A protein has these predicted regions:
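Juxtamembrane intracellular "pre-TM" segments in multi-pass secondary transporters
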Residues: 1-15, 199-235, 256-257, 323-329
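Substrate-agnostic recognition of the 12-TM MFS/MFS-like secondary transporter fold
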Residues: 15-33, 57-95, 110-169, 231, ...
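Extracellular/periplasmic helix-loop-helix junction of adjacent transmembrane segments
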Residues: 34-65
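Transmembrane alpha-helix termini and helix-breaking/packing motifs in multi-pass membrane transporters
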Residues: 34-45, 100-105, 158-182, 256-257, ...
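Small-residue hotspots at the loop-to-helix junctions and early N-terminal turns
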Residues: 47-55, 262-269, 373
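C-terminal ends and interior cores of transmembrane alpha-helices
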Residues: 86, 90-106, 301-330
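Hydrophobic alpha-helical transmembrane segments
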Residues: 108-115, 119, 144-203, 275, ...
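Helix-loop junctions on the cytosolic side of multi-pass membrane transporters
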Residues: 131, 135, 182-208, 314-317, ...
């Protein structure tokens, strides 16, 4: 274990699934950004129209997590997860073919329909993503494997977002590159899924309850019966709220507060994604496969520290042209801001990976996928709460740096509560 978990990338029990989830995360974001870029630059004629479609796209993608997560969890527990993954990848390939036609024709309705389908695809893959790891790996490998999965997801999001937006030509409304890219990646994902080893059913006798609201309520209630699992889900959901608030306001922070152009924003996005990935992988180097919950609140306190420093480091914007990537880093303060962004993301990676690993270990095998699915519902709910929080603070004329300040204080309170309550979990688990 001295070399971390990278040796797992040489093994069939991990590599095919690793590639499959990477390609899936890449494609979700590549298609979404290609679609939004096409709509913004070629299919709409004013900012309000473009922002309307952006809001609709966000709602359509997240909606299936509320409606179908319970069903997805049941299916993942009942059937072979490797087989389920292949079926999901076939669906993704079909969606990408339909989506490529919608991009080529510039049909917004078909694009939105495809994006909704990708939301369904992600909803059904979500429970499998973490529930399948204990089927293939011993407990000592789970922390490292989870770190690789978590870190690679954010790298895939970054690459997909970048490639998706760049695949739409500014002068050519026919998105040939986007069409080619999304279909090829879908084929790659399906191909890699064919090599995933079997992951037999852990709950064959379960009856699939198609009453969505009833089974969702039942699952949400059941996780509260296990204190450690419920607490982990709440902390993970708080992470997604943090990420939603920061990433939602990062473009405006870069433009209107720092007075920098889109190249600086692209760098910030890269720093954030790479920071989480580095933190996710570093956990296993530190703890050598041991799941350490006591370190979680300390990593959360670090997030608060760097978010607070982001507030203090933010200068008053001077009038003038937007700063480019070259001119932005002529000031030490801007280096400090970039460092803060990287480190708050790095610290986030340090605390989410042990929690995701704990969920895998603490969940009963026969209901593991349903518990992961329930976590996804809570994550989606907290992301919506984060969006509402930003809108509310802006309504009361809170400046973006002040939002970061408030966020750092709230996170410190959550970290303190986590520190107190995780002690109880550690005692209960001994």
């Amino acid at each position: 274990m001295g070399t971390g978990a990278f040796y797992l990338l040489k093994e069939r029990r991990f590599l095919p699934f690793f590639l499959t989830q990477f390609f899936g995360a890449f494609n979700d974001n590549a298609f979404k950004l290609a679609m939004l870029t096409l709509i913004s630059y070629h299919l709409t004629h004013d900012q309000a129209q473009s922002e309307f479609y952006q809001a609709i796209a966000g709602a359509l993608f997240i909606m299936p997590f509320f409606l179908l997560s319970a069903t997805a969890g049941q299916l993942a527990d009942k059937y072979d997860k490797a087989l389920m993954t292949r079926l999901i990848k076939i669906l993704e390939l079909f969606l990408m073919i339909v989506g490529s036609f919608s991009l080529y024709w510039g049909n917004i309705f078909m694009m939105m329909l495809t994006l909704t389908g990708l939301g369904v695809h992600s909803t059904f893959f979500g429970p499998i993503k973490y529930a399948i790891l204990p089927d293939h790996l011993p407990k000592k490998d789970l922390l490292g494997a989870t770190g690789l999965i978590d870190g690679s997801t954010f790298i895939a999001i970054l690459l997909g977002t970048t490639m998706g937006s760049l695949s739409i030509g500014m002068n050519n409304p026919r998105p040939y590159m986007a069409v080619f890219l999304t279909v090829i990646i879908a084929v790659a994902g399906l191909t890699s899924s064919l090599f995933i080893p079997r992951a037999p059913s852990t709950s064959e006798k379960i009856k699939i309850d198609m009453q969505i609201w009833r089974v969702t309520y039942k699952m949400l209630k059941q996780v509260t019966e296990h204190f450690g699992i419920f607490l982990s889900i709440l902390i993970l959901s708080w992470f997604w709220l943090l990420g939603t608030v920061i990433l939602t306001k990062l473009p405006d922070y870069t433009n209107y507060v720092l007075g920098a152009n889109n190249t600086v924003f692209a760098l910030f996005l890269a720093l954030f994604s790479v920071g989480i990935a580095c933190g996710s992988v570093t956990v296993n180097f530190i703890f050598q496969g041991r799941i350490s919950l006591p370190m979680v609140p300390w990593a959360m306190f670090a997030v608060s520290f760097f978010t607070m420093d982001l507030y203090w480091a933010t200068p008053l914007m001077e009038e003038g042209s937007l700063l480019t990537l070259n001119t932005f880093f002529t000031q030490f303060t801007h280096w400090r801001i970039a460092f803060d962004l990287f480190m708050l993301a790095f610290s986030s990676g340090l605390f989410v990976v042990p929690l995701y690993t704990y969920l895998q270990v603490a969940s009963p095998p026969q209901s593991r996928a349903r518990i992961i699915a329930t976590n996804n519902v809570y994550n989606a709910l907290f992301m919506v709460i984060g969006t509402i929080m930003v809108i509310s603070l802006l309504h009361f004329s809170a400046a973006i740096p002040k939002i970061f300040f408030i966020l750092s204080l709230l996170n410190a309170v959550v970290a303190l509560l986590a520190k107190i309550n995780l002690k109880r979990v550690v005692l209960l688990e001994k």
